[in-house]
């Protein structure tokens, strides 16, 4: 059996929801307190045992490459000033086996994954979406990517991460139609549906940003016609794969943070900061103070 060694991180999106901040800065470099969102993804991959990572980038994404490259001037400065803890943090982002390829035109997630065909070769691999951060406030939790890799060790089949979402929200996701009940959190899947209307959704089990796929997906993606949004949809290709190979779905029971929109990004930042040793106490005190002020502002005033 071939070991899962490689991961793909699609990072070619334009980040329009975060304009003007993302006009010249990659969305994936926006920080949660003091760490870019893409670094959380890379750390999850490494904790799971992934050995090689390919980041699929686009225009205005050079900052991602710079972040994971050596900065000799900064490292020398930190070393000279004896700032060893900061130097360690900088070193952690450079000692990684990272590769980069550019998606010339954003044609959807399926097309972004297709750019990795030569990198992956004939091996199973993981796709990790940067908008979904998993259990970042729980250091002891088993990484979701690791869970998928363990499933593959048992099934030798593609496995997609899913999570129950409110029924009214299913139109924002790919959704699975499961075959029966889950066995130890693992579903067999009948079909995959991309962004169904709530009345048409086969379940509330939405696909979230972790996929473990067999290399046969690439032949399907090369023939895949554009789907929703006139883009090459990875969900559609997985549904086609499911017709010739079994595809499973792993239900995630941990905490998922969606940093793909402003409010989700803000919630993630607050939750992570409340666990951050350098700021958590000050933030807790501020939130308590702010809560009291907001409650006071709700108290109706009575004029005489």
Curated annotation (Swiss-Prot):
<dbReference type="Pfam" id="PF00483">
    <property type="entry name" value="NTP_transferase"/>
</dbReference>
<keyword id="KW-0808">Transferase</keyword>
<keyword id="KW-0548">Nucleotidyltransferase</keyword>
<comment type="similarity">
    <text>Belongs to the UDPGP type 2 family.</text>
</comment>
<comment type="pathway">
    <text>Carbohydrate metabolism; nucleotide-sugar metabolism.</text>
</comment>
<dbReference type="InterPro" id="IPR005771">
    <property type="entry name" value="GalU_uridylyltTrfase_bac/arc"/>
</dbReference>
<protein>
    <recommendedName>
        <fullName>UTP--glucose-1-phosphate uridylyltransferase 1</fullName>
        <ecNumber>2.7.7.9</ecNumber>
    </recommendedName>
</protein>
<dbReference type="GO" id="GO:0006011">
    <property type="term" value="P:UDP-alpha-D-glucose metabolic process"/>
</dbReference>
<dbReference type="GO" id="GO:0003983">
    <property type="term" value="F:UTP:glucose-1-phosphate uridylyltransferase activity"/>
</dbReference>
<dbReference type="InterPro" id="IPR005835">
    <property type="entry name" value="NTP_transferase_dom"/>
</dbReference>
<dbReference type="InterPro" id="IPR029044">
    <property type="entry name" value="Nucleotide-diphossugar_trans"/>
</dbReference>
<dbReference type="GO" id="GO:0009058">
    <property type="term" value="P:biosynthetic process"/>
</dbReference>
């Amino acid at each position: 059996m071939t070991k899962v060694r490689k991961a793909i991180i699609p990072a070619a999106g334009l980040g329009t929801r975060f304009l003007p901040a993302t006009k010249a800065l990659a969305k994936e470099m926006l920080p949660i307190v003091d760490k870019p969102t893409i670094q959380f993804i890379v750390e999850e991959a490494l904790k799971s045992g992934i050995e090689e990572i390919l980041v699929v980038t686009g225009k205005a994404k050079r900052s991602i490459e710079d972040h994971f490259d050596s900065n000799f001037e900064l490292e020398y400065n930190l070393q000279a000033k004896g700032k060893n803890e900061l130097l360690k943090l900088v070193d952690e982002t450079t000692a990684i086996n990272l590769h980069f390829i550019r998606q010339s035109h954003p044609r959807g997630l399926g097309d972004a994954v297709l750019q990795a065909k030569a990198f992956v070769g004939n091996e199973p691999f993981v796709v990790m979406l940067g908008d979904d951060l998993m259990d970042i406030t729980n250091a002891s939790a088993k990484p979701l990517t690791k869970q998928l890799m363990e499933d593959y060790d048992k099934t030798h089949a593609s496995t997609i991460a899913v999570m129950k979402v409110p029924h009214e929200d299913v139109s924002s996701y790919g959704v699975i139609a499961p075959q029966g009940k889950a066995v130890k959190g693992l579903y067999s899947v009948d079909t995959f549906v991309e962004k169904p209307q709530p009345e048409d959704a086969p379940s509330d089990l939405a696909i979230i940003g972790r996929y473990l796929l067999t290399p046969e997906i690439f032949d399907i993606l090369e023939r895949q016609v554009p789907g929703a949004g006139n883009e090459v949809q990875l969900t559609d290709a997985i549904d086609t794969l499911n017709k010739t190979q079994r595809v499973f779905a792993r239900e995630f029971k941990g905490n998922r943070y969606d940093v793909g929109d402003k409010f989700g990004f803000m919630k993630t930042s607050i939750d992570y900061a409340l666990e951050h040793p350098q700021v958590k106490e000050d933030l807790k005190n501020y939130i308590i103070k702010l809560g009291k002020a907001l409650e006071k502002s709700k108290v109706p005033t009575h004029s005489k």
